[in-house]
Amino acid sequence: MKKILFGMVVCALALAGCGSDTVFDEPERQVYTAENDPALEKLETNVGYYYGDKGVDLTRYEFAYRAAGQYCIFPKTEAREQELSRLSQQEDSQVKNMGGFYLVTRSRDFITSDDFVSDRYFINYYRGEPEFVVICPMIIVRVENSEVKDKILKKYRGKLTLSDRSGQGEMPGGYYLYKFDCHLRTSEQALNLADEIYMRDDVTWAETNKYAPIHLDI
């Protein structure tokens, strides 16, 4: 399992009430126990991270992903955003507006050259039940020296651009927190890049930003 240190920047989307949408057409959620979950045979562990001292598996949910063909899309262009927004408003749409990204269930609606496409990932620690996250096209990096930011931008030119910064590294025990927009195509690529950055000696931690639709049965 690739280790990505988990910080304090997981974004939770409270999307209550969306689970009844027929787009998702999946069985009603049952009380989860790992011992009796038949879908575990379909799971393929890819990556993970630490939450404090606890290791957390991040697993592509192959069973639902292959059966329903659901992908989460972050459009990169304004025209694409308008197109997906228009599709999501159609009565028989297979595109669901999730507020910042789109859940797409029909392949012809997500095969483009520009979108960032995330698989849905199973996360193994939330309340003992299966919960899901999608990977955002953003990587958050914590460093103690602000010069590291420039080294990262130079090494990953074309893949990362600086979006925002915070922190007070000049204070005793201080740090800098940088948010980089990630110009890649897939969640797997973003996770691998975050893992690579985390392995640097001059980086305290790095992770992809995530959305956790914990109130949506997907």
Can you say where each PLM-predicted feature lies in the sequence?
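Positively charged n-region of N-terminal signal peptides that target proteins for export
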Residues: 1-4, 19
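C-terminal motif of bacterial Sec signal peptides marking the signal peptidase cleavage site
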Residues: 14-17
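Primarily auto-inhibitory N-terminal propeptides
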Residues: 23-218
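Sec-dependent signal peptide hydrophobic core
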Residues: 5-10
